[in-house]
Amino acid sequence: MCIVLHPRIPHFFLATLTAALFTLSSAPSIRAAVDGSLGSQIDGYIKSLRARGSISGNERTAWLVRDLTTGTTLASINENSPRQAASMIKPFLALAFFHQVKAGKLLYGPSSRRHMELMIQKSDNGSTNWVMQQTGGPTATKALLARHYPSLCRNLRLVEYIPSNGRAYRNLGSVGDYASFLTALWKKQLPYSDEILRLMALPGPDRLYTKARHIPSGTHVYDKTGSTAMCCGDMGILVAQGTNGRSYPYIVVGVIDSVVRVSSYGSWISRRADVIREVSNLTYLHMKKRYPLR
């Protein structure tokens, strides 16, 4: 099966306006920050936000960036520290389901395909629970993943279904787990890798490309966001296009979680999403120094 790349086209005017306003209000100069290593750039950026009170002492962050052309990890901050997973756990549920399909224990037909699309593209919690039920529920699903894919779920904690209100706070994962999953996925080492990539490329909101002003139109993205009143995150693969006609894939994973439930969900999640976009901007500029990108 061939992978069909699905570029996500941003709303250019809104993206430019939003990015400009955020830059003026909260972001340090990215052009001035690209001289050091990417890890130190990200660390410095987050520390500057903390110093201004834009990220509070109740919030924790974790980041991982990997160049898939060379396999080099370019940034690792709190890589193995468990953070709230939110919907970023859903690609792992897809993996467990497709493992059972490959084993001949489940069928992947029109109904299950629709549930899978709703789970990944729309983050539908009812479909998420349906998928998890097929693999035996939270405990059995975690056991399956730990048995067959131990290197992908070292810090994964799967203990609950997703309630209708979406307030599931006890499932955990680390940015290291997400990056390991995405690396294996890109290398086609997982069952139904092409289908999982297709699902993660379906059009939808993301925090890695859309409204990230330094990333050019036509960059392909495969991702899954996670959002609760205690977590804002995104895990994804971006495929940058080079001026030489080659493609340069890389992973960006960012998670910001709060130890307390925030009261103003809308504004909190929007501002944290913009922080992740700025880290994605930093990453693209760093990759542009490594390769002849557009």
Language-model regions, residue ranges each:
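Short, conserved catalytic-motif segment at the N-terminal edge
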Residues: G57-R83
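Second-shell loop/turn segments in exported
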Residues: A33-G36, S76-Q84, K102-L106, R114-L118, ...
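Structured C-terminal helix/loop/strand segments within mature extracytoplasmic catalytic/sensor domains
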Residues: A33-R50, I55, L74, W186-L208, ...
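A conserved catalytic-loop motif detector
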Residues: A168-D223
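Active-site SXXK
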Residues: G71, P82-L106, M119, V252
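Bacterial N-terminal signal peptides
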Residues: L14-S25
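Mid-domain, small-residue-enriched loop/turn segments at the edges of structured enzyme/sensor domains
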Residues: R60, M132-Q189
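Bacterial N-terminal signal peptides that target proteins for export
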Residues: C2-T16
